[in-house]
Design a protein with these regions (language model features):
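Intrinsically disordered, low-complexity Ser/Thr/Pro/Gly-rich regulatory segments
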Residues: 1-202
């Protein structure tokens, strides 16, 4: 059985290349995560006027939370900076900071909205480059190899995410099954239909 999928068949927005990359990472995790985990796509966390986007989120009981920023197309890191695209059209990006900021925003939001233990559970931020080969021995100060998911890692994506959470995740303890359910319920945030509201009031 696959993990819980929210939504079951996500519609990834953005450019064709960007959507294809996010879909590739989502499918890789869908196919490798255990059935007690949950896989969420395209989440937004609004803090005041600042919006954080989470491309893919793994909620894994007994392990923790994995916040993944996906960057499609060719990715390079040179002169201490990240670039997406091919010269002369490459543009500068900061995927590690994006993912890190989103992780902090998510854990703060969880702690403030009824899941304080989940907000303190182990959580890691990762970056995924599904169209870029990343050598096994590569690493950068802000991005050890364990938090970088390259094209060659997709076949074993869940194991890579698990190692990232266990080796590099902040927090105090693994995520319990109960807290995982709370996280999924809070993030899914179903809005009752008019019929359901009438039935509940009857």
């Amino acid at each position: 059985m696959p993990p819980r999928l929210i939504p079951p068949d996500p519609h990834f927005a953005g450019s064709r290349a960007g959507a294809a990359g996010e879909r590739a990472v989502w499918r890789a995790l869908r196919d490798t995560l255990p059935d007690d985990a949950a896989l969420l796509a395209d989440l937004g966390v609004l803090e005041g006027a600042r919006e954080h986007e989470i491309d893919v989120l793994v909620v894994w009981p007994g392990v923790g939370l994995g916040v993944i920023e996906v960057k499609s197309g060719p990715i390079e890191r040179r002169d201490g900076a990240w670039y997406q695209g091919r010269p002369p059209n490459a543009h500068r990006i900061d995927p590690v900071r994006q993912s890190q900021d989103a992780r902090h925003a998510l854990t703060r939001w969880l702690a403030a909205n009824g899941a304080p233990d989940a907000g303190r559970a182990r959580a890691a931020h990762l970056v995924a480059f599904p169209h870029t080969d990343v050598p096994r021995d590569w690493h950068a100060p802000e991005a050890p190899r364990g938090v970088v998911l390259g094209r060659g890692d997709l076949a074993d994506a869940a194991a890579h995410v698990r190692r990232a959470i266990e080796d590099h995740g902040g927090g105090h303890a693994p995520l319990t099954s109960t807290d995982a359910d709370v996280v999924v319920a809070l993030l899914d945030a179903p809005l009752p239909s008019h019929t359901e509201l009438l039935a509940a009031a009857a």
